[in-house]
Amino acid sequence: MDKCWFTLDNAHYPPPSLDSMRSGHPISPASLGHLIPSLAHLDQIINAKAIEPFPATMDIHGPTIIEDFKWDHSHEYSLSLGGKVPIPLAPAGVPFVDLNVGLGGAFSRSVANYWEFDRLERYIMQPTRSYVQKCIERDEVKRWIAKNKSMMMMGRWEVYMITGIIVARGGGRKKKEKTTGKEFSVEVTVEVPLIVEAGPGGKRNTARQKTWGTSQTGDFVWAVRLAKITKSGLHSDWKMETVFGKTSSFRGQKAIF
């Protein structure tokens, strides 16, 4: 099953009520039917004043309940470099003696994300073509399209409609830990035949660790599902498709499930 739910960077979007969404006047900036330029610009809602009211044939499905939800998403990166450079000293008048300079470096980084919720509620809707057509014909949406369509691509434009939301209830927590470490070493070795190896060496280590956490006691919209609506100058009509995590055109952002 393809992943299509994208988490929001902020936890300050209050959940909308079903009645407010059905009536076309949602009380949250993250509501079903909202049109946005991208997930990175969730605050820039194109139809912020009002959304097209849902027709009776296009109801909201949910809530689907998920209880005692835990999500751990961690990344760890590491990089190491090393090498040795031999420098013969014979041209300098010291026969059969070699000078070796060794360089080494290491870098590591780890980032951990952890969410825990008592309860998640999932709401989705399936927009019909007639509903989407009414949405893009609203004055504020037409103005946005006229201003942002690409003349370099023959008038192409795209917007994203929120078609699903996941509301976190019961107080979620988010913890992050970031650790970085650096090591840099230099070693100089003199090698002389039949003589014990000797030489100066130097090493430097630096380490840095940051740990922080936030708690969220109120309910908020945690994740959204999106439909991409786009029209090319080469086509007479627009098309719509659900955005999945593997979709490269969605700026590389990954879906969680």
Curated annotation (Swiss-Prot):
One of its GO terms (biological process) is programmed cell death. It comes from the Eukaryota. It is found in: Cytoplasm; Cell membrane. Disulfide bonds: none annotated. The keyword Membrane applies. Keywords: Cell membrane, Cytoplasm, Membrane, Necrosis, Transmembrane, Transmembrane beta strand. GO terms for molecular function: protein heterodimerization activity; wide pore channel activity. One of its GO terms (cellular component) is plasma membrane. It is a multi-pass membrane protein. Gasdermin-like protein involved in heterokaryon incompatibility, a process that ensures that during spontaneous vegetative cell fusion, only compatible cells from the same colony survive (non-self-recognition). In N.crassa, the rcd-1 locus exists as 2 incompatible alleles, rcd-1-1 (this entry) and rcd-1-2 (AC P0DW10). During the allorecognition process, forms a heterooligomer with rcd-1-2, thereby forming a functional gasdermin-like complex that binds to membranes and forms pores, triggering cell death. Binds negatively charged phospholipids, such as cardiolipin and phosphatidylserine. Heterooligomer; the heterooligomer with rcd-1-2 forms a ring-shaped pore complex when inserted in the membrane. Belongs to the gasdermin family. This is Gasdermin-like protein rcd-1-1. The gene is rcd-1-1.
